[in-house]
Amino acid sequence: MNIRATVLASFCLFAMPVLMLAQTDEIQVYDGEIAPPGIFNLMIHNNFTPKGRTVPDYPGAIIANHSYQVTAEWAYGVTPWFEQGLYMPVTSPYSSNYGSTINGFKIRELFARPNAHDHTFFYAANFEFSVNHHYWESRTITSEIRPIVGLHLHPWDFIYNPIVDTDYTGGLGNLQYNPSGRAAYNFNDRWALAAEEYDGFGPLHGFLPLSKQFHEVWATSDYSGSEFLGLSVETGVGYGLTTASDKWTLKLMLSRNLNVHPWRP
C-alpha cells in the first residue's frame, strides 16, 4: 500500500466514528412539547458555522467551515401524546466545497407525556428516520433514538436528551452516543435564557479519545408569544471545546402554528 492510500485509510478509520456529527439539520434540545391535536406547526432551522472544521469528516462530506444549513420541520399533533414530523427539505444553501445542495429528508415520531409543561417531571421519546445524500451522511439511511427527560422547577427548567444514532452497521455496540442538555431560566411565560451542551462521545463499545470527541457549549435566548407575527424564536451561539468540534456556530429557529382551528383528515 502506498503512502497516499495509507493516509486515506487512516483518515477514514478515525473519521467514521464521528461521521454522524459531520453536519446537522437541527441544533435543539427537545423539551417534550408537541403540537396540540389537529394543529400544524412549521419550524425553520437556520445554522451557520462562521468558524468550523476545515476538512470533511469523511471523504466527500460537506465541509463545516462557513457552511449554512436551512431545514423546514413540519409537525402535526395527532393525539395529546403523539406528534408526527417531517423534515423536508434539508438543505445547505452554501458550503465551501459544494455550494448549494439539497441533502435529504427525515421522518420523525414524537411520543410525549401530555401537557408536559404542566408537570414537574416530564418525559418523551423521539424516533427519526433519515434518507441522506452522500455528502450529508456517509450512509444513505440513518436513524436517531432520542429519550427526553426533564424537570420544570419554576422558574428553572432542566432537560436531558441521551441520544443514540445509528447507520445500521456494527450492531448495538456501534450506536453513537450524542447527548444534549439544557438548563433554562424563565423570566416569564415568554422570555427565557438558557445554557445548552451538545456532545458526541463516539460508539458505545468504546468512546473516542477526548480530543476526537465533539463538545459544544451554547448560550441561547427564547421568545414565545404573539408580538412577532405569532412566531416563537430561539437564537444561540455555540463554542467548541475540542479540536473535533466547530469553534463557533450560530443558530436561529423560527416556529409558528399554521392553523387556529384543529383539522382532522
Question: Model segments located where?
Answer:
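Transmembrane beta-barrel domains of Gram-negative outer membranes and organellar outer membranes
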Residues: 22-265
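Cleavable N-terminal export/targeting peptides
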Residues: 1-26, 261-265
